[in-house]
């Protein structure tokens, strides 16, 4: 498999913001790790150096993803763009949303994500089989299989993005 490329078998990461199963959502630590990993990977791909504790981009995206996942809602990048603009929450922590992250600044973040989605080079990230640890490790008949994931062609940000999403998929599959 070659994520982000059609040189081999492409693998789609668009479903990678799908809500984890209820059993994982009920485990606060695991869910927090999945949210943090997904958001960190996305922000790395966007070129945003984001500390999970101080970056308002990271905090907003984490809050949005956590809220949607706790409701059992899947998100793709298009849904995430909409959720950044209209998060569906009035507060982040104890701060009013508009004080913490004004609408104009949220729009700028939404545009960065949209630019990624609209970029011709990102199209390869949306093609192929969905990123699913179970499907990578077992055939449809339940037979074990070996899957080779080649990331040598990716830049550092692309590698970080994919490895983070892959790790989240494996953790979700294990639990």
Each predicted region: which residue ranges?
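P-loop NTPase motor domains
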Residues: 1-175
């Amino acid at each position: 498999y070659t994520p982000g490329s059609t040189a081999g078998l492409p693998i789609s990461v668009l479903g990678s913001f799908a809500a984890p199963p209820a059993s994982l959502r009920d485990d606060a630590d695991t869910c927090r790790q999945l949210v943090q990993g997904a958001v960190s990977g996305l922000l790395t791909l966007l070129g945003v150096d984001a500390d999970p504790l101080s970056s308002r981009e990271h905090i907003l995206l984490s809050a949005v993803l956590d809220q949607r996942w706790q409701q059992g809602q899947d998100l793709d990048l298009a849904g995430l763009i909409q959720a950044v603009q209209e998060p569906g929450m009035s507060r982040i922590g104890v701060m009013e949303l508009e004080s913490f992250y004004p609408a104009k600044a949220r729009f700028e973040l939404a545009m960065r994500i949209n630019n990624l989605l609209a970029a011709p080079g990102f199209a390869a990230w949306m093609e192929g089989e969905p990123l699913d640890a179970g499907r990578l490790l077992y055939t449809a008949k339940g037979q074990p299989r070996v899957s080779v994931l080649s990331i040598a062609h990716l830049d550092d940000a692309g590698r970080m993005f994919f490895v983070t999403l892959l790790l989240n998929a494996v953790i979700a599959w294990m639990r």
